[in-house]
Amino acid sequence: MKIIFMSPKKACLSILYALFTNTRKNEWIGPRVFDVWGLPTKRILKAYKLRLYPTVEQQARIDHTLDCCRFVFNHMLDRQQKIYTRRGEHMSAYDMQKVLTRMKNYLPWLRDADSKALKYACCQVEDAYKHFFKKQCGFPHFKKKRQCAASYTTTKGTSIHIEQRQVKLPLLGWIEARGGKIPDGVIKRATIQRSATGKYYASILM
């Protein structure tokens, strides 16, 4: 075993670097959160809500992705119910995403929607079943077309950018936005919502 001696100052800097960086990707991830025993815990994520003012074309793209996500969710939920009734099994999110890829061959209009949002809809079906089996909620139900409010989540954080009074979202490009000041940080995902009154919002998770 090789022993390395270093000055106290260099040792402190090495410890801080280990705490504030991702050792696998060598990325700066910010301070970690520690519990009462001084042990590192999961980082706390926070969502920031923005009011969106999309153009007519951007509204059409948002509405199309909302419709596609609802269709995928209902289709996968229907498959889950049939598989569980026949064999007592259920599909994983990965299995549903493979089915989704095949669906795009005979349902080409799915290709015009946000692909990450469609995959996330499959994850939502899996999560709904997990919560049901853990008795945390009721049995999953189908989403209605005429729901008062609708939303979808895009998970490609590297394609989401925020500047003064505008936000860039996958498939939509730059959209005029209003809201509170959002600090710099790593963006995980964004949830785009259409309210019952026809207003559009984006919830940015960091």
What is the predicted function of each stretch?
Residues K2-M206:
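Nucleic-acid substrate recognition interfaces
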